Design a protein with these regions (language model features):
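N-terminal glycine-/serine-/threonine-rich phosphate-binding loop
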Residues: 1-19, 26, 36
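Acidic/Gly/His-enriched mid-domain segments of enzyme catalytic cores or analogous surface patches
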Residues: 27-116
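Short alpha-helix boundary/capping motifs
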Residues: 19-20, 107
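Generic alpha-helix detector with strongest preference for long hydrophobic helices that associate
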Residues: 10-11, 20, 54, 98
Length: 117
């Protein structure tokens, strides 16, 4: 409900701010012509594929997928504007991909968006 109230303000300032969007809110922004700079997802099931139906609008956004995102979601998206983010956990740090870094993605997409910002 609070997002719906803020959509006109977000639309007015979309070119003056970086917009992070949880995948579940993507359709709401699309309906108002708001293009997020980043779209985040950390779903381990493929139920979230429904949020990524409008591939044309996604071309202008960077899609940040948490390393546990379901493979079907990863495959369905354009690799050019996607990035896989590793959790800040010992299991993932063992991959020794330190040049890429690690993020505390948390357990929900709003935490992931906040940490990424």
């Amino acid at each position: 409900p609070s997002l719906a109230k803020q959509l006109p303000l977000l639309k007015a300032y979309q070119d003056k701010a970086v917009i992070f969007c949880a995948d579940g809110a993507l359709s709401m922004l699309e309906k108002k012509g708001i293009v997020p700079d980043y779209v985040t997802n950390l779903d381990f099931t493929d139920l979230a594929m429904k949020f990524f139906q409008n591939k044309e609008n996604l071309k202008q956004s960077i899609i940040a997928l948490e390393c546990a995102t379901h493979p079907n979601i990863v495959r369905s998206l354009n690799a050019e504007n996607c990035m896989i983010v590793l959790r800040n956990k010992a299991l993932y740090q063992r991959f020794n991909l330190n040049d890429f870094g690690y993020i505390d993605t948390g357990t929900h997409v709003s935490h992931f968006s906040y940490t990424l910002a």
